[in-house]
Amino acid sequence: MKILVIDNVNYEDYPTGGILNFYRNMLPAFGSDLLLAGITTDDRTPVGIWTHREIDGQEFEYFSMAKVTPSAKRPLIPERITNCFYIKKYIRRILTHNDFDWIVTHKPEVMYFIPDGFMSKTCYIMPGVENPLSISRYPWARKLAGVYDRFFLMPKAAKARKLLAAADLNDRKAFAERSKGKISVDKVIEFPTRYDDSIYGVKRISHDDNEKIFVTVGRLGWFKGWKLMIDALKQTREKVNNARLYFIGDGEDYDKIKDYVHEQGLDDSVNLLGKMAPKEIAVWLNKADVFVMGSMAEGWSTTLVEACACGVPCVVTDFSSAREMVADGKNGFVVSGRDERDFSHKMVEALGLNRDKVIEYDKKFERLAVSHLREDMEKILN
């Protein structure tokens, strides 16, 4: 089976996030059976033609749609809009390489420009089923969420051969309802995020007993709930005075977070560690006493899956799939609402969970290892 992947990533390290992680997992799983169309962040890869590119020691046929300069800052023009320009420009040229059985993408703007004649071999994978404009970094864009659903997303998604979603049943039902009859819930197949089991797993790492380590991983954006986690840490330190919160990741809110931490008098208790390689993240997850996530919305969170793979207790907000992964009192807690006192209470309670029992419970998620990815995708696509 040959798969053409089209997305605005470079399949190596930019932009960071769950979508890139998914493709990173696809590379070793499918190898040379993948054709890659994406972006480039280097000066070596030509734009606008099919060529060959080496990624992690493996050579792939590659089509770069744009040369992009990496930045953690919010661009003046939303990436979804700039994506549309170069996807529209090159989509037909990409499709001239017709040696593929399936087209796979996570991006609705890619799917929108795929000609209808190719939709019968298109698989659209949704990292979450919420309307992406509803959680946009741009306030004006959130006002267009309804228009986006009605005229942009749903009509095209209804034509896709396969719809996969990293979301639980309730959210998949909500997505089907939003389609106004265009898409049935049965067509939206649950497909959880995967973790790289060659990197993420249980490793006993000792740390200073005088410190209780809370770790969160993800983009530094408002929708990831950084304020909730910082406020909750401040509450937690009233009971656990050696509690510290470590942010792993980069993003447009870096300076805002630094300023807010200073305003709250938490300079010695909150650390922004920046972007890290997966192996470094795995070390921190194993070192952590508790993993925390304050997201306003998620699909099947990659970092939550990775945290469970490392056997660390998790305290998370009630986003899609949270209750699929976290069982209260077993391997962590799911917190309804966005009250920092409730979140803090569960952070403290999670410190008391038996780590060995958490590790034993989390073994049930070994089925989400990337070593099963190809087999699981082929069952759906064949």
Residue ranges and their predicted role:
Residues I3, W102-V104, P115-S136, L164:
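Active-site proximal beta-strand in glycosyltransferases
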